[in-house]
Amino acid sequence: MTEHKSGFVSIIGRPNVGKSTFVNRVIGHKIAIMSDKAQTTRNKIQGVMTRDDAQIIFIDTPGIHKPKHKLGDYMMKVAKNTLSEIDAIMFMVNANEEIGRGDEYIIEMLKNVKTPVFLVLNKIDLVHPDELMPKIEEYQSYMDFTEIVPISALDGLNVDHFIDVLKTYLPEGPKYYPDDQISDHPEQFVVGEIIREKILHLTSEEIPHAIGVNVDRMVKESEDRVHIEATIYVERDSQKGIVIGKGGKKLKEVGKRARRDIEMLLGSKVYLELWVKVQRDWRNKVNFIRQIGYVEDQD
Protein backbone atom coordinates (compact mmCIF):
# COMPACT_ATOMS: atom_id res chain seq x y z
CA MET A 1 0.00 0.00 0.00
CA THR A 2 1.34 3.44 -0.98
CA GLU A 3 2.06 5.70 1.98
CA HIS A 4 0.18 9.00 2.17
CA LYS A 5 2.37 12.05 1.48
CA SER A 6 1.80 15.52 2.88
CA GLY A 7 3.84 18.69 2.86
CA PHE A 8 4.11 22.45 2.52
CA VAL A 9 5.46 23.83 -0.75
CA SER A 10 6.49 27.44 -1.32
CA ILE A 11 6.13 29.03 -4.75
CA ILE A 12 8.66 31.79 -5.29
CA GLY A 13 9.51 33.89 -8.32
CA ARG A 14 9.52 37.35 -9.83
CA PRO A 15 6.19 39.19 -10.24
CA ASN A 16 3.96 37.93 -13.05
CA VAL A 17 5.51 34.49 -13.63
CA GLY A 18 2.17 32.75 -13.06
CA LYS A 19 2.34 31.68 -9.41
CA SER A 20 -1.29 32.53 -8.69
CA THR A 21 -2.44 30.92 -11.93
CA PHE A 22 -0.66 27.72 -10.89
CA VAL A 23 -2.25 27.69 -7.41
CA ASN A 24 -5.72 28.22 -8.86
CA ARG A 25 -5.10 25.49 -11.46
CA VAL A 26 -4.08 22.75 -9.00
CA ILE A 27 -6.68 23.68 -6.37
CA GLY A 28 -9.50 23.99 -8.89
CA HIS A 29 -10.86 27.16 -7.26
CA LYS A 30 -9.92 30.82 -7.40
CA ILE A 31 -7.91 31.34 -4.20
CA ALA A 32 -5.00 33.49 -5.34
CA ILE A 33 -5.59 36.80 -7.08
CA MET A 34 -4.67 36.85 -10.78
CA SER A 35 -3.75 39.97 -12.74
CA ASP A 36 -1.27 41.11 -15.36
CA LYS A 37 -0.21 43.90 -12.99
CA ALA A 38 2.96 43.22 -10.97
CA GLN A 39 2.91 42.66 -7.19
CA THR A 40 -0.72 41.57 -6.90
CA THR A 41 -0.08 38.87 -4.27
CA ARG A 42 0.40 40.40 -0.82
CA ASN A 43 -0.14 37.56 1.66
CA LYS A 44 0.96 33.96 1.82
CA ILE A 45 -2.03 32.36 0.12
CA GLN A 46 -2.30 28.77 1.22
CA GLY A 47 -4.08 26.61 -1.30
CA VAL A 48 -4.75 23.06 -0.18
CA MET A 49 -4.59 20.35 -2.87
CA THR A 50 -6.00 17.03 -1.66
CA ARG A 51 -5.62 13.77 -3.60
CA ASP A 52 -6.15 10.16 -2.50
CA ASP A 53 -2.42 9.64 -1.95
CA ALA A 54 -1.29 13.14 -0.94
CA GLN A 55 -2.15 16.53 0.46
CA ILE A 56 0.01 19.46 -0.64
CA ILE A 57 -0.33 22.92 0.87
CA PHE A 58 0.93 25.53 -1.60
CA ILE A 59 2.15 28.85 -0.25
CA ASP A 60 2.00 31.53 -2.93
CA THR A 61 4.60 34.10 -1.89
CA PRO A 62 4.63 37.76 -2.96
CA GLY A 63 6.74 38.34 -6.07
CA ILE A 64 10.33 39.24 -5.27
CA HIS A 65 11.05 42.92 -5.90
CA LYS A 66 12.93 45.84 -4.38
CA PRO A 67 10.63 47.33 -1.70
CA LYS A 68 9.56 50.96 -2.19
CA HIS A 69 7.39 51.36 0.92
CA LYS A 70 6.37 49.67 4.17
CA LEU A 71 3.91 47.37 2.39
CA GLY A 72 6.70 46.32 0.02
CA ASP A 73 8.98 45.59 2.99
CA TYR A 74 6.26 43.39 4.46
CA MET A 75 5.76 41.52 1.16
CA MET A 76 9.49 40.77 0.95
CA LYS A 77 9.67 39.68 4.58
CA VAL A 78 6.83 37.22 3.99
CA ALA A 79 8.60 35.78 0.93
CA LYS A 80 11.93 35.24 2.70
CA ASN A 81 10.43 33.83 5.90
CA THR A 82 8.41 31.33 3.90
CA LEU A 83 11.57 29.61 2.65
CA SER A 84 12.49 28.41 6.13
CA GLU A 85 9.10 26.86 6.93
CA ILE A 86 8.47 24.34 4.18
CA ASP A 87 9.24 20.92 2.66
CA ALA A 88 9.95 22.00 -0.92
CA ILE A 89 10.44 25.17 -2.97
CA MET A 90 9.06 25.83 -6.45
CA PHE A 91 11.16 28.49 -8.18
CA MET A 92 8.89 29.59 -11.02
CA VAL A 93 10.21 31.49 -14.03
CA ASN A 94 8.85 32.58 -17.39
CA ALA A 95 10.14 30.25 -20.09
CA ASN A 96 9.63 33.00 -22.67
CA GLU A 97 11.80 35.61 -20.93
CA GLU A 98 15.52 36.14 -20.46
CA ILE A 99 17.04 35.47 -17.04
CA GLY A 100 16.91 38.82 -15.27
CA ARG A 101 18.46 40.42 -12.21
CA GLY A 102 15.42 39.43 -10.18
CA ASP A 103 15.92 35.76 -11.10
CA GLU A 104 19.62 35.95 -10.21
CA TYR A 105 18.74 37.57 -6.87
CA ILE A 106 16.35 34.72 -6.04
CA ILE A 107 18.86 32.06 -7.13
CA GLU A 108 21.48 33.53 -4.78
CA MET A 109 18.93 33.34 -1.98
CA LEU A 110 18.03 29.73 -2.87
CA LYS A 111 21.66 28.58 -2.87
CA ASN A 112 21.65 28.96 0.92
CA VAL A 113 18.61 26.77 1.64
CA LYS A 114 18.71 23.03 2.35
CA THR A 115 15.14 22.46 1.15
CA PRO A 116 14.69 20.74 -2.27
CA VAL A 117 14.36 23.39 -4.99
CA PHE A 118 12.36 22.68 -8.16
CA LEU A 119 12.85 24.91 -11.19
CA VAL A 120 9.48 25.28 -12.90
CA LEU A 121 9.58 26.94 -16.31
CA ASN A 122 6.07 28.30 -16.87
CA LYS A 123 4.37 29.54 -20.07
CA ILE A 124 5.94 26.91 -22.33
CA ASP A 125 2.93 27.41 -24.60
CA LEU A 126 4.60 30.69 -25.62
CA VAL A 127 7.98 29.11 -26.45
CA HIS A 128 9.15 27.07 -29.44
CA PRO A 129 10.34 23.60 -28.28
CA ASP A 130 13.81 24.25 -29.77
CA GLU A 131 14.26 27.24 -27.43
CA LEU A 132 13.38 25.36 -24.26
CA MET A 133 16.49 23.20 -23.78
CA PRO A 134 18.98 26.09 -24.10
CA LYS A 135 16.94 27.99 -21.50
CA ILE A 136 17.05 25.01 -19.11
CA GLU A 137 20.81 24.64 -19.59
CA GLU A 138 21.28 28.35 -18.88
CA TYR A 139 19.47 28.03 -15.54
CA GLN A 140 21.46 24.88 -14.72
CA SER A 141 24.67 26.91 -15.03
CA TYR A 142 23.56 28.99 -12.02
CA MET A 143 22.82 26.17 -9.54
CA ASP A 144 21.90 22.51 -9.22
CA PHE A 145 18.14 22.17 -8.98
CA THR A 146 16.49 19.09 -7.47
CA GLU A 147 14.29 18.75 -10.58
CA ILE A 148 13.49 20.91 -13.61
CA VAL A 149 9.97 20.73 -15.04
CA PRO A 150 8.50 22.88 -17.87
CA ILE A 151 4.75 23.58 -17.59
CA SER A 152 1.93 25.84 -18.73
CA ALA A 153 -0.15 26.75 -15.67
CA LEU A 154 -2.73 28.49 -17.85
CA ASP A 155 -3.35 25.48 -20.12
CA GLY A 156 -2.58 22.82 -17.50
CA LEU A 157 0.15 21.36 -19.72
CA ASN A 158 2.51 19.08 -17.74
CA VAL A 159 1.04 20.27 -14.42
CA ASP A 160 -0.10 16.78 -13.34
CA HIS A 161 3.35 15.41 -14.21
CA PHE A 162 4.96 18.07 -12.03
CA ILE A 163 2.66 17.18 -9.12
CA ASP A 164 3.66 13.51 -9.47
CA VAL A 165 7.36 14.46 -9.41
CA LEU A 166 6.86 16.78 -6.45
CA LYS A 167 5.05 14.12 -4.41
CA THR A 168 8.06 11.79 -4.53
CA TYR A 169 10.09 14.34 -2.53
CA LEU A 170 7.50 15.04 0.16
CA PRO A 171 7.52 13.29 3.55
CA GLU A 172 4.99 10.66 4.54
CA GLY A 173 2.32 12.17 6.74
CA PRO A 174 -1.37 12.67 7.48
CA LYS A 175 -3.81 15.16 6.01
CA TYR A 176 -3.48 18.53 7.71
CA TYR A 177 -6.82 19.80 6.42
CA PRO A 178 -10.26 18.25 5.72
CA ASP A 179 -10.85 17.07 2.14
CA ASP A 180 -13.18 19.95 1.30
CA GLN A 181 -10.95 22.75 2.65
CA ILE A 182 -9.07 24.58 -0.09
CA SER A 183 -7.51 27.48 1.83
CA ASP A 184 -6.55 28.44 5.37
CA HIS A 185 -7.74 32.00 4.83
CA PRO A 186 -11.20 32.96 6.12
CA GLU A 187 -13.83 33.53 3.44
CA GLN A 188 -13.80 37.26 4.19
CA PHE A 189 -10.15 37.50 3.13
CA VAL A 190 -10.80 35.67 -0.16
CA VAL A 191 -13.82 37.90 -0.84
CA GLY A 192 -11.62 40.99 -0.40
CA GLU A 193 -9.03 39.54 -2.79
CA ILE A 194 -11.69 38.86 -5.43
CA ILE A 195 -12.85 42.50 -5.24
CA ARG A 196 -9.24 43.70 -5.52
CA GLU A 197 -8.65 41.46 -8.54
CA LYS A 198 -11.59 43.00 -10.41
CA ILE A 199 -10.29 46.51 -9.69
CA LEU A 200 -6.85 45.56 -11.04
CA HIS A 201 -8.42 44.22 -14.22
CA LEU A 202 -10.46 47.35 -14.81
CA THR A 203 -8.12 50.19 -13.81
CA SER A 204 -5.03 51.76 -15.30
CA GLU A 205 -1.37 51.26 -14.38
CA GLU A 206 -1.28 54.08 -11.79
CA ILE A 207 -3.89 52.42 -9.56
CA PRO A 208 -2.89 48.79 -8.72
CA HIS A 209 -0.45 49.07 -5.81
CA ALA A 210 -2.46 51.89 -4.20
CA ILE A 211 -5.53 49.65 -3.81
CA GLY A 212 -6.47 48.04 -0.51
CA VAL A 213 -9.78 46.30 0.23
CA ASN A 214 -11.37 45.70 3.62
CA VAL A 215 -14.53 43.60 4.03
CA ASP A 216 -16.35 45.56 6.74
CA ARG A 217 -19.38 43.31 7.09
CA MET A 218 -20.37 39.86 5.84
CA VAL A 219 -23.69 38.53 7.10
CA LYS A 220 -25.79 35.55 6.01
CA GLU A 221 -29.28 37.08 5.83
CA SER A 222 -31.04 33.88 4.79
CA GLU A 223 -30.30 30.35 3.60
CA ASP A 224 -29.43 31.54 0.10
CA ARG A 225 -28.36 35.18 0.52
CA VAL A 226 -25.23 36.84 1.94
CA HIS A 227 -24.93 40.61 2.49
CA ILE A 228 -21.38 41.97 2.05
CA GLU A 229 -20.15 45.52 2.64
CA ALA A 230 -16.58 46.38 1.61
CA THR A 231 -14.43 49.50 1.47
CA ILE A 232 -11.90 50.09 -1.30
CA TYR A 233 -9.00 52.27 -0.11
CA VAL A 234 -6.91 54.45 -2.44
CA GLU A 235 -4.20 57.03 -1.68
CA ARG A 236 -5.35 60.04 -3.73
CA ASP A 237 -8.59 61.74 -4.77
CA SER A 238 -7.68 61.25 -8.43
CA GLN A 239 -7.46 57.49 -7.86
CA LYS A 240 -10.87 57.52 -6.19
CA GLY A 241 -12.29 59.09 -9.34
CA ILE A 242 -10.69 56.42 -11.53
CA VAL A 243 -12.08 53.54 -9.44
CA ILE A 244 -15.60 55.02 -9.33
CA GLY A 245 -15.59 56.00 -13.00
CA LYS A 246 -17.92 58.36 -14.87
CA GLY A 247 -21.33 58.21 -13.26
CA GLY A 248 -20.18 55.33 -11.06
CA LYS A 249 -19.87 53.06 -14.10
CA LYS A 250 -16.46 51.56 -13.23
CA LEU A 251 -17.38 50.75 -9.62
CA LYS A 252 -20.65 49.19 -10.78
CA GLU A 253 -18.72 46.90 -13.16
CA VAL A 254 -16.27 45.96 -10.37
CA GLY A 255 -19.24 44.99 -8.20
CA LYS A 256 -20.91 43.00 -10.96
CA ARG A 257 -17.77 40.96 -11.75
CA ALA A 258 -16.83 40.47 -8.10
CA ARG A 259 -20.35 39.37 -7.13
CA ARG A 260 -20.32 36.67 -9.80
CA ASP A 261 -17.09 35.10 -8.45
CA ILE A 262 -18.10 35.53 -4.80
CA GLU A 263 -21.40 33.74 -5.46
CA MET A 264 -19.45 30.83 -6.94
CA LEU A 265 -17.15 30.80 -3.89
CA LEU A 266 -19.95 30.93 -1.30
CA GLY A 267 -22.57 28.93 -3.18
CA SER A 268 -25.30 31.50 -2.50
CA LYS A 269 -26.70 34.78 -3.80
CA VAL A 270 -24.72 37.86 -2.78
CA TYR A 271 -25.80 41.44 -2.16
CA LEU A 272 -22.58 43.45 -2.47
CA GLU A 273 -22.14 47.08 -1.41
CA LEU A 274 -18.88 48.88 -2.23
CA TRP A 275 -17.48 52.21 -1.04
CA VAL A 276 -14.30 54.00 -2.11
CA LYS A 277 -12.33 56.02 0.47
CA VAL A 278 -9.06 57.96 0.37
CA GLN A 279 -6.48 56.96 2.99
CA ARG A 280 -3.43 59.02 2.11
CA ASP A 281 -0.11 57.17 1.93
CA TRP A 282 -1.69 54.05 3.51
CA ARG A 283 1.05 51.72 2.24
CA ASN A 284 3.49 53.38 4.67
CA LYS A 285 1.16 53.19 7.69
CA VAL A 286 1.91 49.93 9.47
CA ASN A 287 -1.18 49.97 11.69
CA PHE A 288 -3.47 50.58 8.73
CA ILE A 289 -1.79 47.79 6.74
CA ARG A 290 -2.59 45.44 9.63
CA GLN A 291 -6.14 46.80 9.89
CA ILE A 292 -7.02 45.83 6.32
CA GLY A 293 -5.71 42.32 6.71
CA TYR A 294 -2.03 42.31 5.76
CA VAL A 295 -0.96 41.01 9.16
CA GLU A 296 2.55 40.11 10.29
CA ASP A 297 3.06 36.49 11.30
CA GLN A 298 3.06 36.08 15.06
CA ASP A 299 6.20 34.52 16.59
From Swiss-Prot:
Lineage: superkingdom: Bacteria
Residues involved in GTP binding: 13-20, 60-64, 122-125
Assigned GO CC terms: cytosol; plasma membrane
Stretches for region G1: 13-20
GO molecular function, one term: ribosomal small subunit binding
Region of interest (G2), residue spans: 39-43
Region feature (G4): 122-125
Compartments, record wording: Cytoplasm; Cell membrane
Pfam families referenced in this protein's UniProt entry, alphabetically: KH_2 (PF07650), MMR_HSR1 (PF01926)
Main location group: cytoplasm
Domain Era-type G: 5-172
Domain KH type-2 span(s) in chain numbering: 203-280
Keyword Protein biosynthesis: no
InterPro entries: G_ERA_dom (IPR030388), GTP-bd (IPR006073), GTPase_Era-like (IPR005662), KH_dom-like_a/b (IPR015946), KH_dom_type_2 (IPR004044), KH_sf_prok-type (IPR009019), P-loop_NTPase (IPR027417), Small_GTP-bd (IPR005225)
NCBIfam families hit by this protein: era, PRK00089.1, small_GTP
Family: Belongs to the TRAFAC class TrmE-Era-EngA-EngB-Septin-like GTPase superfamily. Era GTPase family.
Function: An essential GTPase that binds both GDP and GTP, with rapid nucleotide exchange. Plays a role in 16S rRNA processing and 30S ribosomal subunit biogenesis and possibly also in cell cycle regulation and energy metabolism.
Name of the featured protein: GTPase Era
Source organism per UniProt: Staphylococcus aureus (strain bovine RF122 / ET3-1)
